[in-house]
């Protein structure tokens, strides 16, 4: 009988995108009102359609908030997410002003769901759900975050392993407002102990390594106790790359 081996991964300690809004000793993150024109638009690359749509900024944020946070969350949580999403978008618009588009509509930037899609999935709940999302966006209209007078890179995440990551460990860039802190309340998240199970064959395919009967895995950890590198049968890769290859949260 052919034996099938399975590898189960507990998703703890693998770096994810994280944002930490802190108040350093000399400088601080400040929430400001962005005095943009009412017709300010964001150029969104719709990846599956391979098109670029120009969408009013605040309307775009309604689609982002719908895609990035469950509508069942408390209004104040949705409002905080709206500020983070607006900040992230403004930074991308600033960075990509000379490019064809500002931002993409998937998790490479922010998940954006258009109105037609939301109607199809929310069905009879559409009106109440969309009104709650709109309230969160409207009540934070124009609000964004800066550090030392500059719009911050407002990366955000769903669930950490109990600590956020240093920006340098994930993106290779030192940012004083993106440093590791304890985030123990993430332990109550339904995603905290998420796991994925792969057959050995699928696992090798996903990490682009030749199949071997013997599977030897070694890991090193960084200062936050997250996975820094993972070595699979003498092939070393970064923990962040391993996460992306296996599509881990």
How would you describe each model-predicted region?
Residues 56-73, 180-189:
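Acidic/histidine-rich, surface-exposed loop or edge segments in extracytoplasmic proteins
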Residues 91-249:
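Extended substrate/cofactor- or partner-recognition/assembly subdomains adjacent to catalytic sites
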